[in-house]
Design a protein with these regions (language model features):
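Short pre-active-site segment immediately N-terminal to the catalytic Zn-binding motif
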Residues: 73-91
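Active-site recognition of the HExxH zinc-binding catalytic motif
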Residues: 90-103
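Metalloprotease/metallohydrolase-associated module, dominated by Zn2+-dependent proteases
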Residues: 11, 22-69, 76, 82, ...
Length: 185
């Protein structure tokens, strides 16, 4: 796998490593964004799959994405650089589940189909069993991803709210926090 970060201008990729072990710079970039202690779990995941990881500028449309191999290019995951550490870890697990699903089933499996859900929940279980997360995050992840409810349900909104509350750098304003009768643009 390879960990890359877009340069300050976001026009070029800076390659960190393309071999089986992350470079010191790649580990630093990853550790900056992951919850404390989760780096070993992530390295274990990455040892099982050959993939490039790109840390990108913040995007409003998505938290991350997976691109399958194309021509001579290896598969690639991109993840936004501004995510809360737990959100970064969940997004990485989400995209790695796509990569594993692609390797096993190719185009025959739906991107968020049964096979993908199996892989994603397996990675989430590893996160939960590791004991690395605060209880509030563990409970919110269980409620959001291990119930039959839609991901747009209030349980997933509660997880999203935890990321916003726990991330002082976040400038997100929730509608429920705006006083009734307020005027805003």
């Amino acid at each position: 796998y390879c960990l890359s970060k877009k340069s300050m201008s976001y026009h070029k990729y800076q390659k960190i490593n393309s071999l089986s072990m992350l470079s010191a710079e790649g580990l630093r970039l990853l550790n900056e964004r992951l919850p404390a202690g989760s780096d070993l779990l992530v390295l274990e995941w990455l040892e099982r799959i050959q993939i490039n990881i790109l840390i990108t500028r913040p995007r409003n449309s998505k938290l991350g994405d997976f691109r399958p191999p194309h021509k001579n290019r290896p598969p690639r995951i991109s993840i936004n650089s501004d995510l809360h550490p737990v959100e970064f870890l969940i997004t990485l697990a989400h995209e790695l589940a796509h990569a594993v699903n692609w390797n096993k089933h190719g185009r025959s499996a739906k991107p968020h189909g049964i096979e993908w859900k199996y892989e994603f929940r397996g990675l989430l279980l590893q996160i939960l069993e590791s004991g690395l997360l605060e209880t509030k995050f563990e409970e919110a992840i269980k409620a959001c991803y291990f119930k039959r409810e839609s991901l747009a349900s209030s349980t997933c909104r509660n997880l999203r709210r935890l990321f916003d509350i726990d991330n002082p750098a976040s400038d997100n304003v929730r509608l429920e926090d705006i006083p009734v009768g307020s005027v805003f643009l």
